[in-house]
Each structure stands twice: as structure tokens, then as C-alpha cells.
């Protein structure tokens, strides 16, 4: 099952784009699609206009990358087991950060059944050019939604002049020169977004523009001291490590491990879950990490 993360600031046209994707798919592709919609409030207007033929789940009263992050794996697993879709499209709230959504989608529980296929960000052309009137944190979010995208859809292009269009293109290229850039109005797309594969896969290595992840499967317990030593030498480019592991000191106990901003957390897990570790970061030397984890496993 493939996950498409649909990102973009408030009012950029995400829901209209989603409806156009569903319409295009129904007419030409006919893949099985399910939707996971996120809304900060307790009521999601957008979900009411999707139609009953498309399965969807909702995450309400919070942001998918903050308050509701732990619920993402549960909701995606539910969609998979109930509907077995080819794709799950996540329409995030406009203030969600794509890296944190990506993080939530690489939960070790999901890795056997789902893979992030592409990160698509839709941009309001005029609003983005005028982003400097917003706070620094808002401006940074708008830019980082573009930075980590595989596909950038520049929407409402009809609202700006030709000179502004050239300037906007220049600014977007400075932020993310590797993404596919599509200009449009009214969120209309002339291509099948479901066929735009944003990642390159080599076994258990998944890479997106600016952010990549490595999924490693252990076949048994590892030495805890060697594991801690490995953690201490991780570069700053490693943003997150998470997964289920066992240590040789207590071979029967599964441990939920999480690591962010240099801080490790260990929590006993009651269930006997697959021993998988996910490493997420920018510019990772993925093969080096795989080799290091091999050494942990076999030493």
C-alpha cells in the first residue's frame, strides 16, 4: 500500500486538489484509494464532500504531526485491514510539518504494509510571495513544506503577474531545486499524481528529497552497550530513530525505543512485535547505517 502525503499551508487548495485526484482516478486510473483527513477542530467539513464511495478516516481536534501523531499508524492500519486500498492519501491540516507526518508514517508497525510513495505540497502563489508579512515561524513552515516535497503544485497561478511568476519560480527553486514543479489554477492537474513516484527504493532504504529513512530488521536481541555506543556517534543529521528491539540482558522483553534531538527513550512493550528499527534524517549515509546495524546484530 502506498501513502501520499498531501501538504500545503492553510487555504492553498488541498481539498480541491484531493477531489480532482479522485475524479481523475475514477475516469482514467481506477485505483483503490482511501483518505485520512486531519482537522484541527472537532468537525471536518471537507470529509462531507468526498462522497461515500471513497473510504476515509478522520483525525480531529489536533494536528497530525503533534497531538494526534500516535494515532496515525492506528488509522492507516485500520484503512488497510478494512479496505485494502492501493493508496492512502493523507490530507494534513495546513499547519502540519511534512517531516513529522513522514515520521508518523514510518512507524515500525506500518513498514510491513505501507510505504510513503510521494510528498506533494500545494502552494498558493500569491500568498507565498507575500509570506514575509507573517511571523517567522509561519514563514519557515511554509518554506519547509516546499523543501521536503517531491512534487510542488503552484496553485492560483492566475492571481499573479508574469514578473511575479518569474520571481516565484526563482524562490521555489532556491528552496527545492529537485522537486517536480507544476503550475496550475483551481488545483487542476493534467497528470496522474498517483503515478508520480517520489521515492527511490533499494531494499529497505527509502529516500525523498532532503529526507530519507532506513528500515532495519533484527533477527534477535542485541547488546545494549553496543547499541548505546552506536547512538552516541550518530550525526546531527539523524532526526529520529524508533522501533522495537530486544537486548541480550533480557532476551524475552521487547522494548519500544524512541530517539529524537539526542534524547533516547526506552519503554517496555507488552506485545511481541517485529524487531524493526527506523532511522530518519537528512542526507543519511544509508549503507553505512545498515552496515553499523549489521555489526550490532552479528557481534
Predicted regions span which residues?
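C-terminal accessory "lid"/substrate-recognition subdomains
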Residues: 144-272, 284-286, 298-299
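Short, Lys/Arg-enriched, disordered terminal segments
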Residues: 1-2, 25, 294-299
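Flexible loop/N-cap segments at domain edges
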Residues: 279
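Nucleotide-state-sensitive switch-loop elements of NTP-binding domains
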Residues: 2-7, 12-134, 140
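A generic "cationic amphipathic patch" detector
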Residues: 19, 23, 30-31, 85, ...
Amino acid at each position: 500500500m502506498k501513502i501520499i502525503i498531501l501538504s500545503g499551508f492553510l487555504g492553498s487548495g488541498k481539498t480541491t486538489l484531493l477531489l480532482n485526484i479522485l475524479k481523475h482516478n475514477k475516469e482514467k486510473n481506477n485505483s483503490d484509494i482511501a483518505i485520512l483527513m486531519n482537522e484541527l477542530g472537532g468537525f471536518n467539513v471537507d470529509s462531507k464532500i468526498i462522497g461515500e464511495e471513497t473510504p476515509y478516516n478522520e483525525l480531529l481536534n489536533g494536528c497530525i504531526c503533534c497531538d494526534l501523531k500516535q494515532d496515525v499508524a492506528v488509522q492507516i492500519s485500520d484503512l488497510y485491514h478494512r479496505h485494502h486500498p492501493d493508496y492512502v492519501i493523507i490530507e494534513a491540516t495546513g499547519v502540519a510539518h511534512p517531516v513529522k507526518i513522514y515520521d508518523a508514517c514510518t512507524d515500525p508497525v506500518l513498514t510491513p504494509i505501507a510505504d510513503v510513495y510521494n510528498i506533494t505540497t500545494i502552494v498558493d502563489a500569491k500568498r507565498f510571495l507575500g509570506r514575509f508579512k507573517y511571523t517567522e515561524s509561519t514563514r519557515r513552515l511554509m518554506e519547509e513544506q516546499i523543501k521536503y516535497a517531491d512534487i510542488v503544485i503552484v496553485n492560483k497561478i492566475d492571481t499573479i503577474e508574469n514578473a511575479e511568476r518569474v520571481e516565484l519560480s526563482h524562490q521555489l527553486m532556491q528552496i527545492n531545486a529537485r522537486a517536480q514543479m507544476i503550475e496550475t489554477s483551481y488545483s487542476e492537474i493534467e497528470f496522474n499524481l498517483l503515478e508520480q513516484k517520489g521515492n527511490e527504493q533499494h531494499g529497505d532504504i527509502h529516500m525523498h528529497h532532503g529526507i530519507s529513512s532506513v528500515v532495519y530488521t533484527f533477527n534477535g536481541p542485541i547488546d545494549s552497550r553496543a547499541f548505546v555506543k552506536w547512538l552516541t556517534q550518530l550525526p546531527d543529521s539523524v532526526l529520529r530513530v524508533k522501533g522495537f528491539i530486544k537486548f541480550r540482558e533480557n532476551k524475552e522483553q521487547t522494548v519500544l525505543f524512541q530517539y529524537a534531538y539526542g534524547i533516547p527513550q526506552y519503554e517496555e512493550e507488552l506485545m511481541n512485535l517485529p524487531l524493526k528499527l527506523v532511522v530518519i534524517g537528512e542526507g543519511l549515509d544509508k549503507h553505512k547505517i545498515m552496515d553499523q546495524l549489521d555489526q550490532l546484530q552479528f557481534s
